[in-house]
């Protein structure tokens, strides 16, 4: 779903998610992914993985609708419809349906069977390998759930009395930071976790289902060691008979720009104070090579910054401080944060330490030896590209494809990725990287403090004063803001928070 991010694969080697955008001019899709569109508009994508014969077969059905499509009176419809679907047998007999769901969840990495968000509804199945019977049943079930659902007062009541297996993104839509981030956005008042309003009117839910659950708004993805021709034939037979066409475009979710202010938010999401130095920019799809190279440069600059600050803190023997970086795309906004984990009574001094290093990098740049070491490391990682690809299991491959879809990024072949990445690393200079660092560190930044509930509210004015005193614009610093497509979240070499 939105906002998800990928970290390092295979001992530090970034792989398929970034392998998404390479090729001079327009980027060409990876031919390993077979794809097509049925006559009713449903899109399908299949990746066969003979190199992973023992992996599970991953299936996702993405429906381009969520809670943002609801009016006030329709609140809860987008969550209720998949709940109804999960309590029906989907054209199978009851025993088959039970068996499908018992085997259709990966015990090692369980996913909710359905995730509803503001603009999407995602059905998830993970099947044992070499079970063509289950694959056929899964496709039949999904087609039935998304095109032939029985919606009556009885089926609604049955669903509401059953355990709610439908998850939302974000998982906690009422969490304090998320509510703060929604201010001024089109998403307010469209909570995907909202319950149905009483009295429940079955006909109106059915009308909503028929309006938004149309095949031309669906994308089916299959990844695994399967016979592609057989799977495509099955998709044609099973989904080709679905009816309906979108008459109304789906509303587009957007977030307002992040306000550059200092705020404290009480939340159950943290056990220790976490201060985020945060900035965001508009997100642009990546479909051509110039955007890819800008992204790579900005991403490498962020990684260099992370390691520089981390090493500076280690050299100063700083204790009681944890450092992390975090970048992601949230509804057309590319958001990055430098996260400081700190005891409450050391927040001011720890922010002072980090801000001084950031100002130093902004004004003087990175030392050339740090730049050379980072580029050498990246070249070494690139040599292990195909080994990492071989180790990427079907769950990872599917997750990366989903992120590329949602952020409108073109996936290309690993061979093309390797060539362009090599050319990029060979042509990069310390001056180019330092220019990017100046741009990013010259953004107006927000100070977002997450505090455990019950803790006294911190004096954010004092924290802002610490920041302003150190980070006041320097005459040596560039004043240009970061380019709009310099930030892409799911494909970062920055390691997770320590």
From Swiss-Prot:
The answer on whether this UniProt entry bears the keyword Phosphoprotein reads no
Say where the protein is mainly found.
periplasm
Q: Which GO terms describe its molecular function?
A: metal ion binding; metallopeptidase activity
> Which GO cellular component terms are attached?
periplasmic space
Q: Where in the cell is it found?
A: Periplasm
> Protease among the record's keywords?
yes
Q: Kindly indicate where the leader peptide sits in this chain.
A: 1-24
Which residue pairs form cystines in this protein? none
Question: Which example biological process does GO assign this protein?
Answer: proteolysis
What are the record keywords, sorted? Hydrolase, Metalloprotease, Periplasm, Protease, Signal, Zinc
The extra comment attached to this record reads: Has lost the active site residues.
Q: Which family does it belong to?
A: Belongs to the peptidase M16 family.
**Name assigned to this protein:** Protein YhjJ
**Species name for this entry?**
Escherichia coli (strain K12)
């Amino acid at each position: 779903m939105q906002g998800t991010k990928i970290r390092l694969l295979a001992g530090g080697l970034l792989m398929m998610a970034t392998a998404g955008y390479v090729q001079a001019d327009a980027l060409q899709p990876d031919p390993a992914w077979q794809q097509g569109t049925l006559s009713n508009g449903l899109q399908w994508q299949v990746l066969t993985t003979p190199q992973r014969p023992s992996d599970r077969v991953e299936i996702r059905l993405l429906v381009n609708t969520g809670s943002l499509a609801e009016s006030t009176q329709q609140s809860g419809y987008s969550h209720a419809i998949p709940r109804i679907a999960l309590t029906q047998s989907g054209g199978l007999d009851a025993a088959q349906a039970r068996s499908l769901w018992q085997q259709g969840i990966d015990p090692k990495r369980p996913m909710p069977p359905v995730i509803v968000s503001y603009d999407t509804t995602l059905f998830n199945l993970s099947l044992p390998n070499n079970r063509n019977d289950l694959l056929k049943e899964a496709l039949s079930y999904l087609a039935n759930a998304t095109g032939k659902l029985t919606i009556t007062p009885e089926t609604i009541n049955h669903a509401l009395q059953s355990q709610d297996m439908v998850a939302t993104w974000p998982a906690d839509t009422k969490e304090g930071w998320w509510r703060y981030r929604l201010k001024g956005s089109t998403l307010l008042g469209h909570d995907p976790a909202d319950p149905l309003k009483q009295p429940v009117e079955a006909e109106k839910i059915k009308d909503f289902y028929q309006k938004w659950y149309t095949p031309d708004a669906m994308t089916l993805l299959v990844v695994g060691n399967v016979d592609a021709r057989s799977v495509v034939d099955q998709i044609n037979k099973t989904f080709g008979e679905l009816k309906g066409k979108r008459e109304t475009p789906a509303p587009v979710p957007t977030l307002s720009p992040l306000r550059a202010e200092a705020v404290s938010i009480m939340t159950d999401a943290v056990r220790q104070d976490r201060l985020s130095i945060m900035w965001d920019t508009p997100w642009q799809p990546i479909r051509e090579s110039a955007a890819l190279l800008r992204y790579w440069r900005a991403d490498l600059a962020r990684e260099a910054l992370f390691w520089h600050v981390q090493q500076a803190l280690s050299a100063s023997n700083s204790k009681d401080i944890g450092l992390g970086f975090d970048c992601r795309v949230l509804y057309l906004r590319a958001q990055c944060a430098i996260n400081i984990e700190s005891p409450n009574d050391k927040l001011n001094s720890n922010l002072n330490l980090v801000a001084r290093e950031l100002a130093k990098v902004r004004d003087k740049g990175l030392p050339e030896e740090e730049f050379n070491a980072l580029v050498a490391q990246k070249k070494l990682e690139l040599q292990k590209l195909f080994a990492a690809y071989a180790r990427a299991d079907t769950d990872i491959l599917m997750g990366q494809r989903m992120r590329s879809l949602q952020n409108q990024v073109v996936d290309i072949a690993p061979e093309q990725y390797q060539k362009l990445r090599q050319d990029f690393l060979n042509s990069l200079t310390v001056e180019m990287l330092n220019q990017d660092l100046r741009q990013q560190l010259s953004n107006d930044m927000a100070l977002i403090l997450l505090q455990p509930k019950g803790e006294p509210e911190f004096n954010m004015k004092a924290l802002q004063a610490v920041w302003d005193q150190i980070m006041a614009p320097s005459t040596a610093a560039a004043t240009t803001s970061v380019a709009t497509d310099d930030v892409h979240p799911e494909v970062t070499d920055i390691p997770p928070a320590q």
